[in-house]
Amino acid sequence: MEILHDEDVDDSILRDKTIAVMGYGAQGDAQANCLKDSGINVVIGETEILGGNKNPSWEKAKEDGFEVLPIDKAAEKGDVVHILLPDEVQPAIYENQIKPQLKAGKALCFSHGFNICFKRIVPPEDVDVIMVAPKAPGTEERKAYLEGFGVPGLVAVKQNPSGEAREVALAMTKAMHWTKAGILECTFEQETYEDLFGEQCVLCGGLVELMRNGFEVLVEAGYPPEMAYFECVHEMKLIVDLVWQGGIKRMAEVISNTAEYGMWAVGHQIIGPEVKEKMKEALKRVENGEFANEWVDEYKRGIPFLKASREKMGEHQVETVGAEIRKLFAQK
């Protein structure tokens, strides 16, 4: 894939446009401030009152110097309507507050393709649909911008009736300094399917289960829980940092020969062909929409499984022991 940088992108197309950022959470905060600091006209769309109280996100956006409007008013004002709300709440807010404000020539922008990919949001045909997706959390994104650099990102175009959708999306990434690191062009489907697969099988689901099971095996074999936590959870960051810095090869060069031998001799016996087949099944469930339907149904029912899972993990010994171990690293 070609990687695009500053010299490949012209962001002047944004100079006469207003970007309405919907939501002022971690990504809304980071992206809106980066755009604003690059001279782009940005307004924030938020809910002013939540549960009878002032919405902290509304107040913070005002304190940060933004014009903050109700979501429908911001959508009306924006040439680019950039939806950075949680996936599960986007469809209802879009249908009731954003869709009535759309007209030909506007662009709908996302940082994750879930609702477009699975048709939870179906935009009008005369509206551009684009995606700008940073490959970093909001805090790191903003930190990199302030340091004069940026984070890598993805760009995708789903609809382009105006003929300038790609240019607008790329211009947004340049204004946020992502092109200083590098931009990859993809499709909504590629970003969505790979993101969900990675979260479920490797980064979140796979990693958590690997750590939890490793911890349990040691504890059940009679080893001290504190030592089990160090070996199976705490030291994970040390290894991941090495991979992040120089790849798997570099990590293997840095660890001891004993550790490397064990990695090659035993690792494939734990994560073997049968696990790979399970991963393939999970990918199919993502691609055919089965997982999306399951998650939407879970949300409609009040997230009972999610709540129960959170409670169960909170009570697990790995969490109670971990809380004590982390105190050892807290500065007094």
From Swiss-Prot:
**GO BP:** isoleucine biosynthetic process; L-valine biosynthetic process
Question: What keyword terms does UniProt attach to this protein?
Answer: Amino-acid biosynthesis, Branched-chain amino acid biosynthesis, Magnesium, Metal-binding, NAD, Oxidoreductase
Q: Which residues bind substrate?
A: 256
Pfam families xrefs: KARI_C, KARI_N
- The residue ranges of the KARI N-terminal Rossmann domain are 1-186
Q: Which residues of this UniProt protein bind NAD(+)? A: 24-27, 46, 55, 57, 87-90, 138
Q: In which pathway does it act?
A: Amino-acid biosynthesis; L-isoleucine biosynthesis; L-isoleucine from 2-oxobutanoate: step 2/4; Amino-acid biosynthesis; L-valine biosynthesis; L-valine from pyruvate: step 2/4
Matching entries from PROSITE patterns are given as: KARI_C, KARI_N
Q: Tell me the cofactor note.
A: Binds 2 magnesium ions per subunit.
Annotated active site residues, numbered on this chain, are: 112
Which residues does Mg(2+) 1 bind? 195, 199
Entries under HAMAP family matching the protein: IlvC
Quaternary data: Homodimer.
The molecule here is called Ketol-acid reductoisomerase (NAD(+))
